[in-house]
């Protein structure tokens, strides 16, 4: 050992210690670089797979033969509306989920796409119409939108005109690629919508997309419905007859009629879904029967002023709405009812013509007034 060589505290030459430290640092840097490179490669692979498959149809139409899983209305409706081939849409709340588009083809010869939006507020319906009418989309370049079938749930027409039911993934609602990272680098999208379908090979049938196919016979009937039914609290003060008029008018104008008037090429078919008689039981207990009846008449007659509008009223089908065998809860009906309504759109049965809302609502009122709720709800 040279006389000038320094020794560190461990007894090793200081130069060896510095050399080992430098080598160790180089190894750490190499490992970090390898890790970063691997991570970047995996992220790029994830993004590339997502773009190629595009399970939310954000960039292109479905790949032929890929078994797409479609079960996310908020994320998949925008891309479906823009990039699939169809000439008609079905939209609205969960009252539309059990429609089968094959029934529409059989009844009217239309190629319909179902774009249900559970709990849809008027603004949610407007958003779907925005996607469907995008003139730059593959869908609209292929054909005009000739029909729109829309469920009207009057209760939500008191919502704010810009209010939506659920927070929206806005990066899927615009066309900017700059904010698509939450889609392209999304673990759930990759695993559940890209890789899982490849393994399971069980594609969603778009004819029945979003349908509650898990609801078998035991989920329907009086016993099942009543065990989950909670009657509304009784309110002593009655709502004024015009309580809902102003908010309803605003929603009609901004979120519905603006599209009807801008698109005379489309025939709009609006329908009032057949909730069970228990819906009206709650309306009476909440003491807004007159206000609700007035709201129905306002919406129906306002829509019927437009030349390209048809209106159907299904709520006064007494044999249906008073038989809970048709229902899974106090509002939601079986797919057989959806099939019947689709057939009616073709035949015109239950269609209301201008000035006709008062008559069907009088019939509905007579059903409610004469129904023996006490006996119906009594324990068996």
At which residue positions do the language-model features occur?
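Short extracytoplasmic
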Residues: 68-95
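Secreted/periplasmic serine-hydrolase-like ester/acetyl group-modifying domain
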Residues: 151-152, 161-262, 358-380
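Hydrophobic membrane-insertion alpha-helices, especially the h-region
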Residues: 33-54
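Alpha-helical transmembrane signal-anchor/signal-peptide segments
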Residues: 52-74
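Conserved, well-ordered alpha-helix/loop/beta-strand core segments that scaffold catalytic motifs
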Residues: 148, 223-306
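Membrane-embedded segments
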Residues: 91, 95-183
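N-terminal Lys/Arg-rich, disordered targeting/topogenic segments
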Residues: 1-30
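C-terminal regions of proteins
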Residues: 297-380
């Amino acid at each position: 050992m040279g006389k000038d060589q320094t020794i560190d505290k461990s007894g090793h030459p200081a130069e060896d210690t510095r050399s080992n430290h430098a080598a160790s640092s180089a190894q750490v840097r190499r490992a970090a670089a390898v890790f970063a490179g691997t991570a970047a490669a995996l992220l790029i692979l994830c993004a590339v797979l997502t773009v190629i498959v595009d399970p939310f149809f954000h960039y292109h139409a479905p790949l032929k033969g890929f078994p797409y899983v479609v079960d996310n209305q908020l994320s998949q409706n925008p891309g479906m509306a823009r990039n699939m081939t169809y000439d008609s849409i079905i939209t609205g709340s969960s009252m539309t989920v059990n429609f089968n588009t094959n029934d529409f083809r059989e009844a009217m010869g239309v190629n319909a796409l179902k774009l249900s939006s559970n709990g849809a507020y008027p603004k949610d319906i407007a958003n779907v119409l925005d996607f469907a009418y995008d003139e730059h989309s593959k869908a609209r370049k292929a054909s005009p939108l000739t029909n729109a079938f829309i469920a009207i749930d009057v209760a939500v027409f008191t919502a704010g005109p810009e209010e939506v039911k659920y927070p929206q993934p806005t990066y899927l609602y615009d066309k900017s690629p700059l904010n698509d990272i939450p889609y392209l680098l999304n673990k759930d999208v990759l695993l559940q919508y890209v890789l899982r379908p490849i393994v399971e090979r069980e594609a969603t049938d778009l004819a029945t997309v979003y349908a509650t196919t898990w609801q078998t016979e035991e989920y329907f009937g009086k016993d099942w419905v009543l065990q989950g039914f909670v009657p509304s609290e009784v309110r002593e003060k009655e709502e004024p007859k015009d309580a809902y008029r102003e908010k309803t008018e605003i929603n009609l104008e901004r979120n519905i009629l603006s599209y009807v008037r801008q698109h005379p090429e489309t025939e709009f078919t609006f329908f009032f879904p057949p909730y069970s008689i228990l819906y009206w039981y709650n309306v009476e207990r909440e003491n807004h029967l007159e206000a609700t009846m007035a709201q129905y008449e306002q919406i129906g007659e306002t829509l019927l002023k437009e030349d390209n509008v048809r209106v159907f009223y299904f709520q006064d089908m007494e044999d249906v709405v008073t038989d809970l065998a048709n229902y899974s809860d106090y509002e939601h009906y079986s797919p057989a009812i959806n099939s019947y309504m689709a057939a009616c759109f073709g035949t015109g049965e239950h269609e209301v013509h201008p000035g006709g809302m008062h008559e069907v609502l009088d019939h509905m009122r007579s059903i409610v007034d004469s129904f023996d709720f006490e006996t119906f709800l009594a324990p068996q």
